[in-house]
């Protein structure tokens, strides 16, 4: 854009006519030296380590009509919500080595917001959680200053649903955005010992194979928590034993690592299918997995794991079907929601 002069600090890359600015903030960590000492895997630049920033930036302003790749190629071409928008990125959170989460300091977040305003952005997208109780939180005040400067701020409500009064960023000068969803469900099921459990799946065809719980399929000395979660190389180290997993459907707990990472770990260990189970009430999701998979609710977890522990257990992941159930749109179950706790719960 005319008169745009924001910095571009990237690792082995440059800005272009889409990505027009890139800066990072780590003063509260002790600068580059502090990050290098505590997070040696991180990029000392605005480059994204764990892909969350890339994901949100492309959703907001990705180019129009880009052909999807990988399993999602069945969707054809995809676009961001504002494909003609320019993007300037401000990195103030620093990732764990596994990429499952990131953290930072309030002062760096405020510095990033202030810099975006000073650079002259029109919109700030802030897909990071925050306070649910305090209008005077430093980040909320930084957004008040942004709003006073004419900058529109969209901030995430958070992913702490379905519990009530969990919504973050309660301030009235922010547009706080919950997660919505549609009424198209790719329903799936799995049959164990003549009992069928229903969930979500994109399995194209039925698959029958021996069944094993991940907790019984670990490499010697594998961490029990990582084993229950089916950690793989993408999560910092594989824990499934190929000698035990090969040719089998594996039961994995939801949590910590990306759901698709779990099916990748199963594939890398020679498994042919996966049952992913919630450990607490949450959504079930039809993801593009690396092996045929079905996602079940936490209410089925105990029965599934108990059967998987029996000698000779087998499972049949049934072919998925498209269903239309709820009115749409509606709030996704994982999304944070009101009523607000800030300001005496007036909203």
Please provide the spans of the model-predicted regions:
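Loop-rich non-cytosolic ectodomains and luminal regions
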Residues: 1-347
């Amino acid at each position: 854009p005319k008169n745009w002069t924001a910095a571009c600090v990237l690792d082995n890359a440059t800005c272009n006519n889409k990505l027009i600015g890139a800066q990072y903030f780590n003063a509260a960590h002790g600068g580059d030296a502090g990050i290098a000492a505590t997070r040696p895997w991180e990029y000392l630049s605005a480059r994204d380590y764990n892909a969350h920033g890339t994901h949100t930036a492309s959703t907001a302003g990705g180019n129009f009509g880009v052909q999807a790749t990988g399993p999602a190629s069945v969707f054809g071409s995809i676009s961001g919500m504002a494909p003609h928008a320019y993007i300037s990125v401000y990195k103030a959170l620093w990732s764990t080595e596994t990429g499952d989460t990131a953290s930072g300091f309030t002062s760096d977040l405020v510095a990033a917001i202030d810099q975006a305003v000073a650079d002259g952005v029109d919109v700030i997208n802030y897909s990071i959680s925050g306070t649910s109780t305090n209008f005077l939180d430093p980040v909320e005040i930084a957004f008040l200053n942004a709003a006073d400067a004419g900058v529109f701020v969209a901030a995430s409500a958070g992913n702490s649903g379905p519990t009530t009064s969990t919504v973050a960023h309660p301030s009235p000068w922010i547009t706080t955005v919950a997660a919505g969803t549609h009424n198209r469900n790719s329903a799936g099921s799995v049959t164990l010992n003549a009992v069928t459990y229903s969930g979500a799946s994109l399995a194209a065809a039925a698959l029958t194979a021996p069944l094993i719980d991940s907790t019984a399929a670990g490499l010697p000395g594998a961490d029990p928590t990582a084993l229950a979660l089916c950690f793989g190389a993408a999560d910092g180290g594989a824990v499934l034993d190929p000698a035990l997993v090969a040719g089998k459907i594996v039961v994995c707990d939801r949590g910590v690592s990306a759901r698709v990472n779990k099916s990748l770990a199963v594939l890398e260990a020679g498994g042919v299918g996966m049952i992913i189970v919630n450990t607490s009430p949450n959504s079930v999701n039809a993801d593009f997995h690396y092996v045929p998979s079905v996602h079940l609710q936490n209410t089925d977890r105990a029965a599934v794991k108990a059967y998987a522990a029996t000698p000779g257990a087998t499972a049949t992941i049934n072919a998925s079907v498209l269903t239309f159930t709820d009115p749409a749109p509606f709030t996704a179950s994982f999304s944070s929601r009101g009523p607000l706790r800030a300001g005496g719960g007036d909203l």
